[in-house]
Amino acid sequence: MDVRRRSINSIHQIPSVGGTAPPMLKPKQPTKVDAVDLPDSPKASDALPLPLYITNGVFFTLFFTVVYYLLVRWREKIRNSTPLHVVTLSEIAAIFTFVASFIYLLGFFGIGLVQPFTSRSSHDDVWGVDDDEDVDEIVLKEDTRTVPCAAAPVDCPLPPIKPKVVDPVPISPPSSEEDEEIIKSVVEGTTPSYALESKLGDSHRAAAIRREALQRMTKKSLAGLPLDGFDYDSILGQCCEMPVGYVQIPVGIAGPLLLDGREYSVPMATTEGCLVASTNRGCKAIFACGGATSVLLRDAMTRAPVVRFGSAKRAADLKFFLENPLNFETLAAVFNSSSRFGKLQNIKCAIAGKNLYMRYSCSTGDAMGMNMISKGVQNVLDFLQDDFPDMDVIGISGNYCSDKKPAAVNWIEGRGKSVVCEAVIKEEVVKKVLKTNVASLVELNMLKNLTGSAMAGALGGFNAHASNIVSAVYLATGQDPAQNVESSHCITMMEAINDGKDLHVSVTMPSIEVGTVGGGTQLASQSACLNLLGVKGASKEAPGSNARLLATIVAGSVLAGELSLMSAIAAGQLVNSHMKYNRSNKDVTKASS
């Protein structure tokens, strides 16, 4: 408190007790920064005990002397076959002197860089206190007595003084002016928006500048899109280019899902009301009946380049070469050289005229594996070019893979992880938890999921809403949302067992494409959700086991979601539940632009 009072007394000259109080002396309010007398700014070299040129000479001499001495000793040890780690006291002193002089010289060359910051910090405040209006007002109001603290009587009235608060000089930080210039250059097109990160070296600042430039160019506000609170360095060169913010999606928890004897709390990122609640009800029914079991049928990512020949015969020659078991070991060695985890499993070929499509399948460890398999395929193509010089590589992907598209080849052959998950739901659980009966569920499944989907010409869509659960889990755990297309391929089967009392329900999903490393899995939120499931990162004990476990959890969650939705439809509760949990109460006319 005394420090603050002294700072006020230095501004307002207060007379001693008994003297005539002259008018209060107030500092003249500066109108410009250069109108205020400022003390000389300190220099970085002021901290040195000797003049700068003497200090530099001493350390330069020490540096080169000890370097010469250590080099001579090093040559002598080599000549005498003395181990280098055996050092004398003089050598230890020389090493210490070398390190000290090197650190000094390294710091000396940084003085020019440090100087502007030390100069600027000493000019930040005219009065020697923080440049804050609120702080100035508090300090001025805190001490309003007309005599020094020590001379003030106990019962002395303290007449209020109305000091004139000096407004701080508005000094914009240099970065703001610089940012304004960059924003203008982006708007004018002289600075590419995509180059801001490399130009500035600050991902958050680049996103803020890009965001402001976008608002000025489009004349649309992005006030509702958050900017702060996100690590933009974590997505640089990996997840997203030219960011201007991030989208918030709520994450709910369904479960516990009892699967293969273990309980899982399943994170689901969604904006669809009732989805998490419905999946949670399915988990409850499965849990009450002893849980679900899963089987992993296949684990292989695929990539299918397309090549062209001068004739169909030459395309067939390569097809026969690739499918010949005698050549597989050679091709596998070439393919596997690109990664520790990518192991070639098989090659399936298809011909269309003189064009050949080669579908390579390989294991990819705990990664989803698209980059891994693409590198391996490129190695094989380079190898084949020697024996088939007339082969024209049209593309590393020829859509026979098939990635992010509904395709029969994925439905039949599988892609990623192929999983079957099943459970037996007791009659009393069907009635109490699911509010329906076994016969109604079996009939609905046949007419809706099987016959209805066949009438619609569905491809892998023989289910109620597998895509809902897959999308929600994918968003929460950092998977590629676009791969929901083939990952949601699912056929849901329901059958009455035990004389029609109990329900056997299963989901078969041939192409679940997931990974626990790479891509969006390394983001903080998604990494936390993976950690919740116990599958974060790569498994050191059994490479690939985390990704396989995640695939079975996805299938188990789909099983719970299918069971609950089908029960709601069979019981006639779908409309009521969605009106309760999934209906917007906002006036949409006010939200329209």
UniProtKB/Swiss-Prot annotation:
Pathway: Metabolic intermediate biosynthesis; (R)-mevalonate biosynthesis; (R)-mevalonate from acetyl-CoA: step 3/3
GO biological process: coenzyme A metabolic process; isoprenoid biosynthetic process; sterol biosynthetic process
Start and end residues of each stretch annotated as Catalytic: 178-593
InterPro entries registered for this protein in UniProt: HMG_CoA_Rdtase, HMG_CoA_Rdtase_cat_sf, HMG_CoA_Rdtase_CS, HMG_CoA_Rdtase_eu_arc, HMG_CoA_Rdtase_N, HMG_CoA_Rdtase_NAD(P)-bd_sf, HMG_CoA_Rdtase_sub-bd_dom_sf
Region Disordered: start-end pairs: 1-36
Membrane topology qualifier: Multi-pass membrane protein
EC number: 1.1.1.34
Active-site annotation: 272, 404, 480, 578
Name of the protein described by the UniProt record: 3-hydroxy-3-methylglutaryl-coenzyme A reductase
